[in-house]
């Protein structure tokens, strides 16, 4: 492939896709990623996974503070790219930048557009109980995920799949979809289909508070919520400690109880069942497997319960 490609991306998802392109000998003439960020509880700067991969391959790298900076835009022009590929870069790009490459900018979106436009298509699809996701490649315009569709693929959402697991599956197949798109661009056969605006939905970035579990819902819905916010921002609930103080409890993993009948009041702690802690929902129940009490390390849910002298009777 002779196309000159500039790649814009930041997290591990984008690094996985970039590796697929590099393994296929795509001509990546430059990489753009977000500026290094301080590590939590430390002043040490952390490089993005995309930066680490680009440096390991000796690919020219830019980390602009602002993508509207004239010096940055001038450097992009010097790379004389035929196409820009954007994957989870993390910044909405202005039209001046989008107009630089000969054939435009193409974005790999981890969702089936026009549904789930925004920063959290993977998480919100699972939280909504979705059973099918996929990648969409669009030719970018100045809107948020509103460009014409060039290619789509599909990935089934397993009944126990978390957002982290779906992200891995979408990244693995997304690189191949981009390779197909680049080949079509080079051959002049790529199609651009406008999105159906009537079908558009939004998927804004999740907040930590949205990880809160509402037990007054069917177990299937609660389980979808937990899977959708795993690993980030993470599911959580509250309990009354022995001193009757409300504390937060992170829920790291869970599974559905097979019987779907009524067990008790929503959030009621039904006790230890095997290795799990059984919690009643409005309909059915969930088995909590791994939890993380506030300010403590992760542990088995049954060990948490036993450590509280089995005095925790309800989660809320």
Curated annotation (Swiss-Prot):
Keywords: Protein biosynthesis, Transferase. InterPro entries: Fmt (IPR005794), Formyl_trans_C (IPR005793), Formyl_trans_C_sf (IPR037022), Formyl_transf_N (IPR002376), Formyl_transf_N_sf (IPR036477), Formyl_transferase-like_C_sf (IPR011034), GART_AS (IPR001555), Met-tRNA-FMT_C (IPR044135). It catalyses: L-methionyl-tRNA(fMet) + (6R)-10-formyltetrahydrofolate = N-formyl-L-methionyl-tRNA(fMet) + (6S)-5,6,7,8-tetrahydrofolate + H(+). Its EC number is 2.1.2.9. Disulfide bonds: none annotated. (6S)-5,6,7,8-tetrahydrofolate binds at residues 111-114. PROSITE patterns: GART. GO terms for molecular function: methionyl-tRNA formyltransferase activity. One of its GO terms (cellular component) is cytosol. CDD domains: FMT_core_Met-tRNA-FMT_N (cd08646), Met_tRNA_FMT_C (cd08704). Belongs to the Fmt family. NCBIfam families: fmt. Attaches a formyl group to the free amino group of methionyl-tRNA(fMet). The formyl group appears to play a dual role in the initiator identity of N-formylmethionyl-tRNA by promoting its recognition by IF2 and preventing the misappropriation of this tRNA by the elongation apparatus. This is Methionyl-tRNA formyltransferase. It comes from Chlamydia trachomatis serovar L2 (strain ATCC VR-902B / DSM 19102 / 434/Bu).
